[in-house]
Amino acid sequence: MSNLKISNMIVICLLTLCLVIIQNRNNTAFSQSNFETKFDPIHIEANEGIEWLSDEKVYIARGEATAKQNNFQLKSDVIKAHYRETQTSDTEIYRLEAIREVIVLSSNRIAYGDYGVYDLDNSVTRLTGKNLRLKTALETIKARKSLEYWDKKRLAIAKGNATAQRGEKQVKADTLSVYFSKTKDDSLTANRIEAVGNVKISTPNEVAVGDEAVYYIEKELVTLLGHVKITRGKSQLNGSIAEVNLKTGRSRLLSKSGLDGNQKVRGLFTRDVKQPEKK
């Protein structure tokens, strides 16, 4: 075989190899890797491998996929890592999309959902699906529509028949905004809850309802606005604005003209009457 034929065959083989590489560039698979973000790198791994779709600018991790960044961890059946090009022609992950059996973990909380999106730029996680819940050492927050956690603000937003439970006290509303603070051991504890729409606050001794409420948890003080009704045993108070001390059991009702068209405060008080003993 002449040198010319050998050279031609080598060229053909190289061209064929280049075509194969180009064709498979959009379907590259590997099991784990580190990816750059706007801030700290993120590590992604999966049992069934990670697929790279360069045209769509996304990595797809399948099979018990996990994404880790510092103390943040995202687990799901499938994780899609969306990336973008930077001004220096590098790439960075900016959005994680989790599909099925989503679990969000950190050192001080855990959350569950069916579908989740993590915005790395703003450190915000949004979960949707059934049985949405977020748990800290002391609180459990549930929702039917969506559940968000803003890491920088230490804020959880629960929408759709939302509840926040701490011990025997429960706050329920259409939307709950739960503000947290960090303790000395780096755990989270709720310090304020803002409730909007069909608000109901329950304790073993009383039930308070209204249109809106702000609950200062450490002080155990609640301010209710709009169509307020407080029930303690068989006694009931109605008004436009109420200040309730859950620790002492004292309630103060006010009337505000124009809030709900009712300028009066009403109360119904009952007491148990002992029946005379039969002789």
Predicted regions and their residues:
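Mature-chain termini and adjacent capping regions
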Residues: S2-K279
